[in-house]
Each structure stands twice: as C-alpha cells, then as structure tokens.
Amino acid sequence: MLNDFTGADKVYIACGYTDLRKGIDGLARMVQQQFQLDPFTNTLFLFCGRRRDRIKGLYWERDGFILLYKRLVQGAYQWPRSESEVRSLTPQQYRWLMEGLKIEQPKAHRPVTGLTVL
C-alpha cells in the first residue's frame, strides 16, 4: 500500500531520524511546530527511524488521521540524514525512495529545458 500510495497531493519527508515511538499526535505536532506545515491537508508525511529499516507515514483523510507503518525485512531506506529539515518529493522521487534508491539519482535522465529546433 505504501509503495504505490496515490491518495496524497504532496509527499514530505522529515529528513534525519525520528523517534518512531511517537504516535499520531506527536507526529502531527512535529509537522506543525517543527516544520510549520498543516497536517490537515491532503499530504503524506513520512518519518524514518534510526536504523532506516522502518518508516511511519501520517495522512489526514477528511475525518481522521491514518498512521502507516512499514518495516523492511531486509535492507534499509536511503534516507537523507540532514537533521530538522523537511523536503517535498516529486512522485518519481517517492517511487525511488520506496524502491530503496536515493531520492537524488545522479544518473537519471533530467528533463530537457530550453528546447529549440535546429
């Protein structure tokens, strides 16, 4: 479910490590106070534990919060380590993250800008 989550308009990740003992209220408070974002929007907020093998997702669905939790059996997420930062992800970056890849792919094809016909 979390690998192909399409219900949200935006996806944000809390960079660095989050204490995953926090529940809905603690994570929603973190979104509001630390990142100055509104947890009551159609946005998926992702948090990663210290071992990088589990993540929690917080999502508001019209009448209540959904708390998603995923623990990898093998491997780890390529999670950005910079503390106290939140990043917005493109749909492609979200897929890369869920597939175990870094969100910045140096070898990925970049969109072409400034097109002209020769």
Question: In which residue ranges do the predicted regions lie?
Answer:
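Polybasic/polar functional segments that serve as interface/processing modules
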Residues: 1-118
